[in-house]
């Protein structure tokens, strides 16, 4: 027999909700569970492909990489000019 007042309340008919729609019921310690993805809308389980826009990330990386390389070359040029003047 479990001790009283130490165990969470068990909800045998807890609702799993995705995008405002009840997708299934299960047992849980919360009456409602909000989820973003479930097997009914996940591309792996539905067989659909979702194209991700990664171009923005690549562009951001390339800009950062170019800036870092151009900044470092400018700094090297400045430091070599300062050494020549001394």
Curated annotation (Swiss-Prot):
Provide the alphabetized UniProt keywords.
Answer: Ribonucleoprotein, Ribosomal protein, RNA-binding, rRNA-binding
Query: Residue ranges of region Disordered?
Result: 65-86
State the superkingdom.
Answer: Bacteria
Gene Ontology molecular-function annotations: rRNA binding; structural constituent of ribosome
Query: Residue ranges under compositional bias (Basic and acidic residues)?
Result: 73-86
- Say yes or no: keyword RNA-binding present: yes
What GO CC annotations are associated with the protein?
A: ribonucleoprotein complex; ribosome
The UniProt entry, under PANTHER family, shows:
50S RIBOSOMAL PROTEIN L31, CHLOROPLASTIC, LARGE RIBOSOMAL SUBUNIT PROTEIN BL31C
Subunit comment: Part of the 50S ribosomal subunit.
Name the UniProt record assigns to this protein: Large ribosomal subunit protein bL31
């Amino acid at each position: 027999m479990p001790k009283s007042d130490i165990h969470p309340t068990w909800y045998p008919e807890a609702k799993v909700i995705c995008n405002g729609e009840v997708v299934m019921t299960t047992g849980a310690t919360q009456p409602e569970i909000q989820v973003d993805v479930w097997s009914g809308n996940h591309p792996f389980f539905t067989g659909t492909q979702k194209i991700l826009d990664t171009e923005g990330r690549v562009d951001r990386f390339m800009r950062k990489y170019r800036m870092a390389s151009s900044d470092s070359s400018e700094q090297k040029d400045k430091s070599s000019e300062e050494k020549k003047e001394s």
